[in-house]
């Protein structure tokens, strides 16, 4: 029965184009973001391009994570790897990326994209444990992420109307009192417009006291020129991240050598 449940959860994750990744941010506070969920050899995987590696640094500080996608959740302690030469992307991700993220169909067909978009085909990889995956009914459009009773991170779907502009939001999440993060994510039909609103605060019985808001659900219409500028900015960000990424590779290599 466990194997059947795990297999169905993996199938659900494989079918999902978007999910919610929960992790421990600075100050030991849980935070979440919308991600593309992948599988690699039957193991749930979340990645960052080399331009946007903030969540990778967080997981290296605290390996407790959770991924909710397609009505299935993986949670536990993650491992991190830096796969920056594009070979792993080609082998493990390219087909999934083309299927799940429509804008990739343009990017990955550009002549010379492996050289021009080296930061896109290079990835920092978070691998989650497949053992213990379970079905979690409900949509992941609105979720709350917190530290659960077992000390690990959980991402919990929220059903019903949520008053996003309120300072005190009524929530029935089943999580212990403490810091929590409410995330709402929306995507355009072709995923050219990705939007998320994050509310961080303190969870008490039945309510979230909001302390910080970031992001927006307002639709944006980026012109082709603006999108090209965005790609150039991401390339510059990845270049600026190189020293940091190399230090992670050294650290992870040392950990593997001592393991």
Model-derived segments and their meaning:
Residues 1-43, 146, 151-162:
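An N-terminal domain-cap segment
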Residues 11, 58, 116-120:
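A general structural signal for short secondary-structure junctions and capping/turn motifs
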Residues 14-17, 61-62, 139-142, 177:
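A short, compositionally biased
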Residues 18, 30, 37, 65-67, ...:
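Residue-level detection of beta-strand scaffold positions
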Residues 26, 33, 56, 68, ...:
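Catalytic micro-motifs at enzyme active sites that drive phosphoryl/nucleotidyl and oxygen chemistry
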Residues 38-71, 153-191:
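A short mixed-secondary-structure module that forms the rim of ligand-binding clefts
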Residues 71-152, 172-259:
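Charged, gly/pro-rich active-site loop segments
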């Amino acid at each position: 029965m466990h194997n059947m449940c795990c297999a169905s959860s993996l199938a659900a994750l494989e079918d999902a184009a978007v999910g919610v990744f929960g992790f421990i941010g600075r100050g030991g506070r849980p935070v979440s973001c919308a991600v593309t969920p992948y599988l690699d050899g039957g193991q749930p995987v979340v990645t960052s391009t080399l331009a946007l590696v903030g969540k990778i640094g967080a997981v290296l500080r605290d390996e407790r994570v959770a991924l909710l996608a397609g009505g299935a959740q993986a949670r536990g302690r993650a491992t991190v790897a830096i796969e920056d030469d594009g070979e792993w992307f080609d082998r493990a991700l390219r087909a999934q990326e083309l299927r799940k993220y429509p804008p990739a169909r343009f990017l990955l067909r550009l002549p010379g994209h492996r050289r021009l978009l080296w930061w896109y085909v290079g990835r920092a990889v978070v691998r989650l444990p497949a053992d213990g995956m379970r079905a979690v009914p409900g949509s992941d459009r609105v979720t709350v992420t917190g530290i659960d009773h077992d000390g690990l991170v959980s991402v919990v779907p929220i059903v019903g109307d949520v008053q996003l502009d309120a300072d005190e939001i009524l929530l029935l999440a089943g999580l212990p009192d403490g810091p929590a993060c409410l995330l709402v994510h929306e995507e355009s039909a072709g995923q050219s417009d990705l939007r998320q609103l994050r509310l961080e605060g303190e969870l008490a019985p039945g309510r979230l006291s909001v302390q910080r808001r970031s992001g927006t659900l307002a639709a944006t219409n980026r012109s082709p020129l603006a999108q090209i500028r965005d790609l150039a900015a991401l390339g510059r960000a990845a270049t600026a991240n190189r020293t940091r990424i190399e230090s992670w590779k050294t650290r992870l290599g040392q950990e593997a050598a001592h393991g």
